[in-house]
């Protein structure tokens, strides 16, 4: 259960891009697992290495060329040109390890973004796991491990958490509060919110100090799922259409959180769709 609070998003750490009375908060999620190779019956007892290093490396190099490299270059240019532009990331620990293995230059490009002073990171389960549903101690361990990894690489201490696939319940809130986080990002699900808006700041009955930030699923999905679809009623989806939707919100709904996969730029929607010019 959630209830409305009077605070605005000025209290919360995820960074933002300002537009008139409203704030668009951009948060990009990045994750890649360590893929397992095909393990045949006759491999049992003979082959004890389970990872598909070839596919892992191929995926990282492909995503780097299609998304990470051009998107980071674009964001760095925007950060240098526009002093109000800010952005946040959720990088899983398993992705970071693979970037360190196969494309360390990508880590350096994220570090360049951080050096602008307007890039933040959210804490998440290190392995993008669903440990929060089954093992509280493992969940705590992965959150601490991820926070330490972010601190060691980027010199930034996350103050807001983001559970795997935005999973949330009151027990998760209590755990995150105990770990010292100030807020948690979760899905602004219509069937939970009912008449309430996802563009307001909430708290929970179980953990009042922990702020609850809600993803605007409607606007986020217009970019992530429908941007390049010819059969979408909003095609072509433009910046003007997004800003009209945001600026048409009630004045008290001052913050809109757009949370999506980073691969929306270049991998989900290729360069030819115009996603990098959005």
What are these regions (language model features)?
Residues 17-160, 166-221, 228, 232, ...:
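Catalytic alpha-helical scaffold of carbohydrate-active enzymes acting on polysaccharides/glycoconjugates
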